[in-house]
Regions:
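Secreted/periplasmic carbohydrate-active enzymes, especially glycoside hydrolases
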Residues: 1-171, 175-179, 214-216, 231-232, ...
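Substrate-binding/catalytic cleft of secreted carbohydrate-active enzymes
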Residues: 146-149, 156-360
Length: 360
């Protein structure tokens, strides 16, 4: 018998519908796909289609929207029938939410969640662990870092040049935190102009290198598409391996119109995508502003604090500014936070503090 091989969920809060695309290893016109939507144990919506046609589900009038403040998830039950015979059934989940941008009354383009302005604020999270490096010791450790991030008052995480295991994204969905997903950097560094729009010559990757980038970036988006927490795709960081920026930004937006595209965090800057992303250390500074896109501070901070027995290299402390006491570090953090607060009405729509773990 045939089976379900993949599902892809796309919410549309403006039309109050959920689209579920179901892939199977065969397709026959007599096959039927049925999707049931549950809120807890209660069946709240369902839809049916012929195998190969997306299932469009009208959601209830009192639909619950997903947000960091209220991360409402709906459970899904997806069934594949051959004629009237059930041949496969899988369970999943989805959320109703929308990421977009909109010009506010002062003419500044703002990030929006569910059609409401939202300042997105979170740490640069490179996903490092003291023992396993890129591998977390256990599932609880993944949860701990995300929960701590929320406890600190953040509503977003910039997942920096790393793709996490599926469990991590599920925890973000359940706990309620928005994710900016970076493409891991590759190839070489071209010229980097971070303080103005790029006027240099972009790097040309080899045919093989470009093909690898495009293949892997598509695979990342395919793999993570149905996680509601992901709000922004970030194809490049600080010019590393950056090439054909407007084309890559446009491809990303067309391939997944449900997310925002931050073309190049920290430059090189182009007038494409949904955001202009500045990096400035150590304190926040808005040295460039884009009237057509959301202007964001993609990295700042980097306050280092020496903690005995918490150092990877005991003789080398990390940080753009370094302190020896918790009070000094906290005071500096608050100083930067107050500077940032004053820059929000002037144009910043998001900020990323460096960083969750003290790595380079």
């Amino acid at each position: 018998a045939q089976s379900i091989t993949n599902i892809k969920t796309t919410p549309d809060i403006d039309l109050n519908k959920l689209t579920v695309e179901v892939a199977t290893d065969e397709k026959k016109l007599s096959d039927k796909i049925e999707v049931k939507v549950f809120d807890g144990k209660e069946l709240v919506a369902k839809g049916v289609s012929i195998n190969g046609i997306p299932v469009e589900i009208a959601m209830p009038a009192d639909v619950k929207l997903w947000s960091p403040e209220s991360p409402s998830l709906y459970d899904l039950e997806i069934s594949l029938f051959e004629g009237n015979k059930l041949v496969d059934k899988v369970k999943s989940y989805a959320a109703m939410r929308k990421f977009s941008t909109k010009r506010d009354k002062n003419g500044i383009v703002r990030l929006q969640l569910n059609n409401k302005d939202q300042f997105q604020f979170g740490p640069l999270d490179q996903g490092w662990w003291p023992d396993g490096l890129y591998t977390a010791p256990c599932d609880e450790a993944l949860v701990y870092d995300i929960q701590k991030t929320k406890d600190f008052g953040y509503n977003m995480i910039r997942k920096h040049i790393k793709v996490e295991p599926a469990r991590w994204y599920t925890h973000c969905d359940r706990l309620g935190i928005i994710v900016w997903q970076d493409m891991p950097s590759g190839d070489k560094n071209p010229e980097w102009q971070m303080r103005e729009y790029f006027t240099g010559t972009e790097k040309k990757r080899s045919t093989e290198s470009e093909a690898t980038y495009r293949k892997e970036w598509k695979e990342i988006i395919d793999c993570l598409y149905s996680y509601p927490c992901i709000g922004t795709w970030v194809p490049f960081n600080e010019a590393w391996g950056q090439f054909k920026t407007p084309e890559i930004a446009e491809w990303t937006k067309q391939y997944d119109p449900s997310r925002l595209v931050n073309p190049a965090s920290g430059g090189n800057h182009y007038t494409c995508g949904d955001m202009l992303d500045l990096h400035h250390y150590p304190g926040p500074e808005m040295f460039l502003y884009d009237a057509q896109r959301a202007t964001v501070l993609g990295e700042y901070g980097g306050i280092g604090l020496v903690l005995k027995e918490h150092l990877w290299e005991p003789d080398r402390n990390w940080g753009y500014v370094q302190f020896n006491t918790s009070k000094e570090a906290t005071d500096k953090y608050m100083e930067y936070a107050n500077v940032l607060k004053e820059l929000i009405p002037r144009g910043f729509s998001a900020a990323v503090y460096t960083q969750t773990t003290d790595v380079g």
